[in-house]
């Protein structure tokens, strides 16, 4: 009797269930380290549970945010430097949550690739866990999708989803008024927006990712992968102190597009560009691309990753509090009557 032919398996189609299970086991300790009051369940269930009462809330309003890392991923993939890209993913979500006045509570990630490499995926998700722990946010679940034929070899994509809460009536922006002071919190470089432009500039420069960064520091690739700053704990400390009327996360659209999102109709902002030094990475990008200053200001954070809008009579106190939390704080302008953002001085 002829030997029975072996049937086709899921692994033959390119999906390795065992690799997925191995990844879950490997990242469980990192996820466990992010546990906080309210965390009920660990990884592995069909859904993840979170107890708002145990987290200390009485009449909470939930706030949700989702985001990705954009084409910064391309640099991480091309250089193999994937350890901090997960921090970027968390920062892009939780920094948005805090702008609504919410405390980040829990986070879920989505990791998709053509062929799951457990070691690579673990490095990425451990970075996500690091960002969550630094934000007081529990990593309570996620999805790993192995999809052969959908991605080139070695490529992957990331998305994140965060949920936070605040007590009813504590949402931001609230009470923004003419004369309010704008406090700028320093960025850590490009953060996670504008990387399609960045990659085009690098192409024009003729430099490789392993070349020394023209603006100083490490290799060009590593310098451009500096992780997005997490502003959660220090921003929440300022909010709880009172006097904070709004927070604006400076992402895609730069200062020009993001600050107006937290200003009520009839109010604009005046920013003094001479108040801070343009970081060298932005100067290099602008000079290499012959980029006009208005374009720079509506593309990048230009060294200011978060703007805190505060009552004028509380500005010094809030600035001191933020500085004590480790922030680089600069008084960059004020809220004025009008619309949009106007600028005094020059960055370039």
Swiss-Prot record:
It comes from the Bacteria. SUPFAM superfamilies: PurM C-terminal domain-like (SSF56042), PurM N-terminal domain-like (SSF55326). It holds the Pfam family AIRS. Its EC number is 6.3.3.1. One of its GO terms (biological process) is 'de novo' IMP biosynthetic process. GO terms for molecular function: ATP binding; phosphoribosylamine-glycine ligase activity; phosphoribosylformylglycinamidine cyclo-ligase activity. Pathway: Purine metabolism; IMP biosynthesis via de novo pathway; 5-amino-1-(5-phospho-D-ribosyl)imidazole from N(2)-formyl-N(1)-(5-phospho-D-ribosyl)glycinamide: step 2/2. CDD domains: PurM. The keyword Cytoplasm applies. Keywords: ATP-binding, Cytoplasm, Ligase, Nucleotide-binding, Purine biosynthesis. It is found in: Cytoplasm. Its main location: cytoplasm. It catalyses: 2-formamido-N(1)-(5-O-phospho-beta-D-ribosyl)acetamidine + ATP = 5-amino-1-(5-phospho-beta-D-ribosyl)imidazole + ADP + phosphate + H(+). One of its GO terms (cellular component) is cytosol. Belongs to the AIR synthase family. This is Phosphoribosylformylglycinamidine cyclo-ligase. It comes from Cereibacter sphaeroides (strain KD131 / KCTC 12085). The gene is purM.
């Amino acid at each position: 009797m002829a030997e029975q032919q072996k049937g086709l398996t899921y692994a033959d189609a390119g999906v390795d269930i065992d690799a997925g299970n191995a990844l879950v086991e490997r990242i469980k300790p990192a996820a466990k380290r992010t546990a906080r009051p309210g965390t009920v369940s660990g990884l592995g269930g069909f859904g993840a549970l979170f107890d708002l009462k145990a987290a200390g809330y009485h009449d909470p309003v939930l706030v949700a945010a989702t985001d990705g890392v954009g084409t910064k991923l391309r640099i991480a993939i091309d250089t193999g430097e994937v350890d901090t890209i997960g921090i970027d993913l968390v920062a892009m979500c939780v920094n948005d949550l805090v702008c609504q006045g919410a405390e980040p509570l829990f986070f879920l990630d989505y990791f998709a690739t053509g062929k799951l490499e457990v070691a690579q995926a673990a490095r990425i998700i451990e970075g996500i866990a690091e960002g969550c722990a630094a934000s007081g946010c529990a990593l309570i679940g996620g999805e790993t999708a192995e999809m052969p034929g959908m991605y080139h070899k070695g490529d992957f994509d990331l998305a994140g989803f965060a949920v936070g809460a605040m007590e009813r009536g504590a949402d931001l922006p609230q009470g923004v008024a003419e004369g309010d002071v704008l406090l700028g919190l320093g960025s850590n470089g490009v953060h996670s927006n504008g990387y399609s432009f960045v990659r085009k500039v690098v192409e024009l420069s003729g430099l490789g990712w392993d070349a020394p960064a023209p603006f100083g520091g490490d290799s060009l690739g590593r310098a451009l992968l500096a992780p997005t700053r997490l502003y959660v704990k220090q921003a929440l400390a300022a909010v709880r102190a009172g006097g904070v009327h709004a927070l604006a996360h400076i992402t895609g659209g730069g200062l020009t597009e993001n600050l107006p999102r937290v200003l009520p109709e009839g109010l604009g902002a005046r920013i003094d560009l001479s108040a801070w030094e343009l970081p060298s990475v932005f100067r290099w990008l602008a000079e290499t691309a012959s980029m006009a200053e208005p374009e720079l200001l509506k593309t990048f954070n230009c060294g200011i990753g978060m703007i805190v809008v505060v009552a004028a009579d509380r500005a010094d106190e809030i600035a001191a509090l933020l500085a004590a939390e480790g922030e680089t704080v600069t008084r960059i302008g004020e809220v004025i009557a009008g619309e949009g953002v106007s600028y005094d001085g020059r960055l370039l």
